[in-house]
């Protein structure tokens, strides 16, 4: 963790949910960790300005070096009257271990941003910072929704679906997942698809090395059966096992996997998209004729570039917590930050966290009211909002 400036326009520190400090903001308030990303606070403030220009109902509680942030915000007319700055004296770097942050991170912008959600000052937290530290702090400060074993990170994946995106989880919260964890991921992913993408009956697929039911590890086969049993009562359709090539397809809406596999798939896709853009650029710049062809195809190429631009789907959502946290890429520029803010606003407007928690509580009561088998308990005690 690195030292910074502690001057701020609003007081920091921990506050009880009953008496949150007044930040004077109206509309949907998003708590933003301005520090810790690879591109610095200028990109974060730039993203806030883009989001503010497109959405008059959004406001920001910004956490970090107050002197630097005040100067950056003052340059953005779109942010006039829509930002309150919470000064902090420390920053979580990409090299900090989660255990270090847990022991000595109370004065960091990340801790302050999460606590704003915990204290009811903001609906959603957005951060470009250290993923491990952000998940650890989120779990400790916000706590898991009762009934959830492991939180997950869900991302939007460009696809052939009508919405243009599929949901994939877990993409990095936990490298391990047993059958009941995968069941809970399916239920949380279905809830995300309903509330984030407006899909009332999402189709769930379990990522495997093949679509045949006899393939895969034992926990995948067990998860297959649990998810299939849960589908009729939880408003989703289970399409069974899917392969890597199905992730961007229109045959599935939510892809469920463990965090190790999901993270590798995500990083591979991002690298492949960058490679395709580089190849196209090289091809159209090779000869005078190819440059002319590029000019003639400019509109189509621009449309393609936008479709595969990873900045458009920037923002992984932490699912299974008593509060919504959106993790932006550490290298996100202003466009990427704006995309994460847009996603945060959509989830805030949908009441996603409350819906998920209410469904889990309802399932828990149903489980407690009758004698259930272990498999039935796994199904009824999971999130299905």
Curated annotation (Swiss-Prot):
Main location class: cytoplasm
Family, as annotated: Belongs to the PlsX family.
Sample GO molecular function, one term: phosphate:acyl-[acyl carrier protein] acyltransferase activity
Biological role: Catalyzes the reversible formation of acyl-phosphate (acyl-PO(4)) from acyl-[acyl-carrier-protein] (acyl-ACP). This enzyme utilizes acyl-ACP as fatty acyl donor, but not acyl-CoA.
Gene Ontology terms: cellular component: cytoplasm
Protein name according to UniProt: Phosphate acyltransferase
Compartments in which it is found: Cytoplasm
Extent of Low complexity compositional bias: 1-17
SUPFAM superfamilies in the cross-refs: Isocitrate/Isopropylmalate dehydrogenase-like (SSF53659)
Metabolic or biological pathway: Lipid metabolism; phospholipid metabolism
Quaternary assembly: Homodimer. Probably interacts with PlsY.
Pfam families: FA_synthesis (PF02504)
Region (Disordered) residue spans: 1-28
Source organism (scientific name): Dinoroseobacter shibae (strain DSM 16493 / NCIMB 14021 / DFL 12)
Alphabetically ordered keywords of this record: Cytoplasm, Lipid biosynthesis, Lipid metabolism, Phospholipid biosynthesis, Phospholipid metabolism, Transferase
């Amino acid at each position: 963790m690195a030292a910074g400036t502690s001057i701020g326009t609003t007081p920091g520190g921990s506050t009880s949910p009953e008496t949150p400090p007044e930040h004077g903001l109206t509309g949907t308030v998003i708590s933003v960790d301005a520090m810790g990303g690879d591109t610095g606070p200028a990109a974060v403030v730039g993203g806030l300005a883009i989001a503010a220009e497109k959405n008059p109902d959004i406001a920001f509680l910004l956490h970090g070096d107050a002197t630097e942030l005040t100067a950056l915000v003052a340059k953005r007319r779109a942010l006039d009257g829509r930002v309150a700055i919470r000064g902090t004296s420390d920053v979580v770097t990409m090299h900090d271990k989660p255990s270090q942050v847990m022991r000595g991170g109370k004065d960091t912008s990340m801790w302050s941003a999460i606590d704003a959600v915990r204290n009811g000052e903001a609906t959603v937290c957005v951060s470009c910072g250290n993923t491990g530290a952000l998940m650890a702090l989120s779990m400790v400060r916000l706590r898991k929704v009762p009934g959830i074993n492991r939180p997950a990170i869900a991302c939007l994946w460009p696809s052939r679906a009508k919405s243009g995106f599929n949901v994939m989880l877990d993409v990095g919260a936990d490298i391990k997942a047993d059958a009941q964890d995968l069941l809970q991921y399916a239920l949380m992913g279905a809830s995300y698809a309903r509330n984030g993408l407006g899909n009332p009956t999402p189709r769930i697929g379990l990522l495997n090395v093949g679509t045949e039911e006899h393939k895969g590890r034992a926990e995948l086969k067990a998860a297959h059966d649990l998810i299939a049993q849960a589908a009729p009562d939880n408003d989703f359709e289970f399409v069974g096992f899917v392969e890597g090539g199905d992730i961007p397809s229109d045959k599935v809406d939510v892809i469920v996997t463990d965090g190790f596999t999901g993270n590798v798939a995500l990083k591979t896709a991002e690298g492949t998209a960058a490679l395709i853009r580089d190849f196209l650029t090289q091809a159209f710049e090779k000869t005078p004729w190819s440059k002319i062809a590029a000019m003639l195809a400019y509109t189509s190429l621009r449309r393609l570039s936008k479709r595969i631009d990873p900045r458009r789907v920037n923002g992984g959502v932490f699912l299974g917590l008593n509060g919504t946290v959106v993790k932006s890429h550490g290298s996100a520029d202003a466009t990427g930050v704006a995309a994460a803010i847009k996603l945060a606003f959509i989830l805030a407007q949908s009441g996603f966290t409350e819906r998920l928690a209410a469904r889990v509580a309802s399932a828990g009561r149903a489980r407690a009211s009758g004698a259930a088998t272990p498999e039935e308990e796994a199904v009824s005690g999971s999130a299905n909002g």
